[in-house]
């Protein structure tokens, strides 16, 4: 049998043996990441011990002893062996519409549902490069904010809805998606302006970036709430939501500009010279050579800014806007469900974790896809 195997391959062309099983798969990953040194081994064992002690009671509280059907906290506790022995998810079930739509009129919530669906469709051409006829999809994505604004606010044949009635997950998505969508292009423009050879433009960009970065977001939200109307033309009054969107976008743009500027500075001078040697103009060289490389380098920082901005949307509760966290806090004041803060904060934490973890995983996917180093 061995002679037959040896005759199948010419000398020197025998295929390589598979790598040792200890260096591949889950075993190899564990050896490399969890047990690579004595310190890592100790930390891994301590973490496993902590999980072994904490996960079973948590699972018992959140799943085994939980109550999903009740009309009040007392009814939940009456169904348990002892008060608080399990999670009362009936509270979340009772308030899920409030947490999703805020105070949006019940009979008009179909418009919010359509907006959620259109948002998902608008993300498809942005996230998937190989989508057929992607340029038309990107055109739709660019027009989505105006379509969603018309659906949510009304007008042009639809019943108008005051933005003060926006709240919950809907408000969180509006602020987060708007800030993320507009901060990236504005940040690119500010980063290019800061590196411009035109002194006036460069100074204006530097002043804007440094001023915004030196002021807490809470301060800007208070400015949006109380002072921004004084800087507008007489007789011009914008809704609080519009003013908040402006301030959040400007705040995120300043931080985005610094992230992208770091990517631009990482590009070697030879790349600029390559564009000059091809006879490209400044804008052509940046569009085709410089910016794509800078954006690839900046992906971790960009997504980190997106995640931070999305979590910062909870700060709007300070100026009286009821996002998902604000509505959760307000719901705890209801005597019928008082004392169930744990369930509320776990629900809010899970929502933000799923959203932010999804952005983080997509960032890793992009980094691996665009990795062209050797």
What are these regions (language model features)?
Residues 2-374:
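Transmembrane alpha-helices and adjacent helix-loop boundaries
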